[in-house]
């Protein structure tokens, strides 16, 4: 802890510091780290009633996390619309530090402007975005920790269901010598697939390109996640071009045809794979018999090679 003293010295401001545990003896600012010197300048501007608008570029530079947290509190305290006889001021801050980001509810995201590239216009989430009202998304935002906030600085976040998926992805990344973070990616656990679709939409509103990694049940249960993921003109057009090369009208039509054929096989040809599928953990995971059949059947189709023609053909 330190005291800061600012005095006039030959027409200039002189900044001195004193350690509280060292007899309160002041010493020259030249002995302190540059971060503390920057902090003095920022605090002076924050406390100046004559300053109505303040632009701060990377205030976290050379500051310990605790001082960053303190500075963010001071910035938040004075931020607002300036009024007469009021100390509030408009503050625009550029940062690369999660310590300088405070998010406790989805509406807080409206204060952020995302700059992805010099050649692209900055992006701000519109205040009427329906995704902000999703209860699963609200729960996710309320639980965001410092590690989770790193995804806000990522261009291509990888969305997974839970912490165990993060562990597996990191292990695979290390084993295969993949540099996910250097490539602009960051793994974010959503804690379940219920909020996955809305989270994808939210990150696209930020100008990001999310990738989704989910368990098989997300595809066996319904096509909701598939439809929501391709609910983007650029991504759907690219997928449509790939689908058309194989004679399909589009990616969503292809997905629907495959899913309908799969559900028909589960309904009419279950006995052909029952002896294998019933051994899968998915078969007893829920109380819904049809869901159990679809989930275990999908995993069986993906894992087994020696199935009859009806089940093997769906792979093609």
Describe each region flagged by the PLM.
Residues 52, 61-62:
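Short active-site loops of ABC-family nucleotide-binding domains
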Residues 1-39, 44-53, 77-84:
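Extended helical coiled-coil dimerization/tether regions that scaffold
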Residues 30-33, 134-138, 187-190:
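Short, flexible loop segments at the rims of nucleotide/cofactor-binding pockets, characterized by
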Residues 73-156, 164-171, 176:
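C-terminal lobe/lid and adjacent interdomain/linker elements of RecA-like ASCE P-loop ATPase modules
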């Amino acid at each position: 802890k330190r005291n800061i003293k600012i005095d006039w010295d030959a027409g200039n401001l002189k900044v001195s510091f004193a350690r509280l545990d060292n007899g309160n003896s002041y010493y020259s600012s030249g002995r302190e780290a540059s971060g503390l010197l920057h902090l003095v300048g920022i605090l002076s501007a924050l406390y100046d009633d004559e300053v109505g608008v303040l632009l701060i570029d990377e205030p976290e530079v050379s500051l310990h996390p605790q001082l960053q947290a303190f500075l963010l509190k001071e910035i938040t305290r004075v931020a607002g619309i300036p009024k007469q006889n009021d100390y509030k001021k408009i503050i625009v801050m550029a940062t690369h530090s999660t310590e300088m980001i405070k998010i406790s509810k989805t509406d807080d995201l409206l204060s952020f402007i995302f700059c992805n590239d010099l050649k692209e216009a900055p992006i701000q989430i519109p205040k009427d975005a329906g995704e902000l009202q999703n209860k699963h998304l609200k729960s996710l935002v309320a639980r965001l920790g410092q590690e989770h906030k790193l995804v806000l600085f990522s261009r291509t976040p990888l969305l997974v269901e839970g912490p165990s998926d993060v562990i597996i992805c990191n292990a695979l990344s290390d084993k295969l010598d993949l540099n996910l973070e250097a490539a602009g990616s960051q793994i974010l656990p959503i804690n379940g697939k219920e909020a996955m679709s809305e989270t994808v939409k939210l990150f696209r509103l930020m100008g990001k390109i999310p990738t989704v990694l989910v368990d098989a049940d997300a595809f066996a249960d319904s096509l909701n996640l598939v439809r929501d993921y391709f609910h983007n003109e650029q991504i759907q057009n690219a997928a449509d071009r790939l689908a058309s090369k194989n004679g399909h009208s589009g990616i969503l039509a292809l997905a629907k045809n495959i899913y309908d054929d799969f559900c028909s096989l589960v309904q009419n040809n279950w006995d052909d794979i029952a002896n294998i599928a019933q051994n899968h953990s998915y078969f007893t995971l829920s109380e819904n018999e049809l869901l159990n059949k679809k989930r275990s059947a999908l995993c069986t189709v993906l894992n087994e090679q020696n199935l009859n023609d009806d089940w093997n053909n769906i792979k093609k």
